[in-house]
């Protein structure tokens, strides 16, 4: 892509100054429309070492209210980031609606650098490319404007800048080992950058190659391209996004009405199995920590189905230093202002740890769908987006265990009445629970569709028959133990 690219003819200085003034004024006005229309803008600034990425960002942000933007310089990974999925450090930095985030280098720089230094196999590189394509598409599908710039300078220009920076003691620190390596292997790096850009150049998030030999000319190209992108985003905001066909292998699942709910276990047998299974799970927890295997256990189910008690029996077997339970309620304002998966990306476990979710990302295709908190296009896209999210976690090495806790309508009513009539349990019942119960049939339809469309081979659903809560607890423990034994051997 770089080899075929031709730089635009640089205008005269007077024209550059006039166009710069116009572009700056335009961006200053557009930022108010971005805030008003709640469009999040992610600007990725990539390019050669010493091409001036930081300087360009510094010039652009002078035209934006400081309350509306954030600049992130993506250096080396932190220890925590090394123990999270590849996209974690980028997903957690996406902007809120109505705001800008500027990334000084990002996922392109990381992938190409790892490839050039032999840290990625061909298979891993291909997976990273696919991850990036999904990530960028999910953002743009959900209303984000993603602008990707590559600042390009010739080999001799880079060498000249390195020499100039190294000559002054106050600037020598700005020359990194990677800058020097790039210049020594310029052709190899150029080929790698070109290949990456070809593979990730998409209509919804194209690459913009910028002639970065002259500072003011570079600034003008970036500003004019950015304002054009914003203009298009403002006019296209309400367009529906085409739905993608599922490409992931699905596991056949029964409808909820087909699940027999007469499963029971005797109290003595329950106590015996509970002790044995919890002891075994405790042993496996130690092993998965040593082998650095991350585990994600996701719970969904009817209100009063017994999710809390089920989670309590699993958590009771674990070392408290190695797991966390996340009760998921309605999103906070800062969560609602971002991509709906953001609050789950930011709660993922480290390698060797367990995250247990009491309610999950599946709220998108249940409560958000039925209560009108998102559009029909949003929740219909979400099945594929969730399958992609879980595939990303699976490819990272996570064990994903998903439970639907099933009861019938009569059992729910019995438990609701018990909660309402027992003072120490009244906190468990809310008006919302009763409202949801009135929509039982609609929820059952949504849950059936959810299970059918998201029970993949790498993250299948497990239905827990929970009219007898003790039976459901033992079944859940058995499944968790079996899944961990498969991975740990």
Stretches with model-predicted labels:
Residues 1-489:
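Glycine-rich phosphate-binding loop of ATP-dependent small-molecule kinases
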């Amino acid at each position: 892509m770089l080899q075929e690219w031709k730089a635009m003819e640089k205008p005269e200085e007077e024209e550059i100054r006039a166009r710069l003034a116009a572009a700056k004024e335009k961006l200053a006005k557009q930022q108010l429309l971005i805030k008003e229309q709640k469009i999040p803008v992610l600007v990725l600034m990539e390019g050669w070492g010493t091409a001036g990425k930081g300087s360009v960002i510094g010039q652009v942000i002078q035209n934006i209210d400081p309350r509306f933007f954030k600049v992130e310089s993506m250096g080396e990974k932190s220890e925590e980031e090394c123990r999270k999925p590849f996209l974690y450090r980028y997903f957690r930095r996406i902007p809120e609606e109505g705001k800008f985030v500027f990334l000084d280098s990002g996922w392109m720089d990381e992938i190409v650098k790892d490839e050039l230094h032999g840290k990625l196999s061909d298979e891993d590189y291909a997976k990273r490319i696919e991850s990036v394509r999904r990530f960028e598409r999910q953002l743009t599908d959900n209303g984000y404007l993603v602008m990707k710039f590559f600042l390009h300078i010739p080999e001799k220009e880079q060498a000249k800048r390195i020499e100039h920076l190294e000559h002054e003691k106050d600037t020598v620190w700005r020359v990194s080992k990677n800058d020097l390596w790039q210049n020594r292997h310029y052709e190899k790096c150029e080929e790698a950058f070109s290949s990456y850009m070809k593979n990730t150049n998409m209509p919804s998030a194209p690459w913009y190659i910028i002639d970065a030999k002259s500072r003011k000319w570079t600034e003008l190209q970036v500003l004019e391209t950015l304002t054009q992108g914003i203009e298009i985003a403002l006019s296209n905001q309400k367009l529906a996004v085409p739905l993608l066909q599922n490409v992931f292998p699905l596991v056949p699942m029964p409808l909820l009405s087909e699940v027999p709910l007469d499963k029971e276990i005797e109290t003595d047998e329950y106590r015996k199995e509970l002790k044995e299974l919890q002891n075994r799970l405790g042993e496996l927890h130690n092993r998965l920590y040593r082998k650095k295997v991350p585990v994600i256990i996701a719970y969904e189910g009817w209100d009063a189905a017994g999710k809390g008690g089920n989670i309590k029996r699993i958590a009771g077997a674990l070392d408290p230093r190695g797991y966390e339970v996340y009760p998921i309620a309605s999103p906070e304002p800062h969560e609602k202002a971002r991509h709906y998966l953001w609050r789950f990306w930011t709660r993922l476990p480290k390698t060797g740890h367990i995250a247990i979710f009491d309610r999950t990302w599946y709220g998108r295709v249940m409560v958000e769908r039925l209560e009108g908190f998102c559009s029909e296009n949003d929740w219909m896209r979400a099945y594929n987006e969730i399958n992609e999210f879980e595939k990303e976690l699976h490819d990272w090495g996570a064990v994903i265990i998903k439970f639907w806790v099933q009861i019938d309508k009569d059992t729910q009513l019995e438990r609701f009445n018990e909660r309402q009539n027992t003072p120490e349990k009244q906190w468990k019942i809310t008006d919302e629970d009763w409202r949801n119960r009135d929509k039982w049939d609609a929820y059952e339809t949504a849950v059936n569709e959810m299970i059918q469309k998201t029970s993949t081979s790498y993250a299948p659903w497990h239905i827990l028959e929970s009219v007898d809560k003790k039976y459901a607890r033992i079944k859940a423990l058995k499944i968790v133990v079996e899944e961990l034994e498969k991975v740990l051997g």
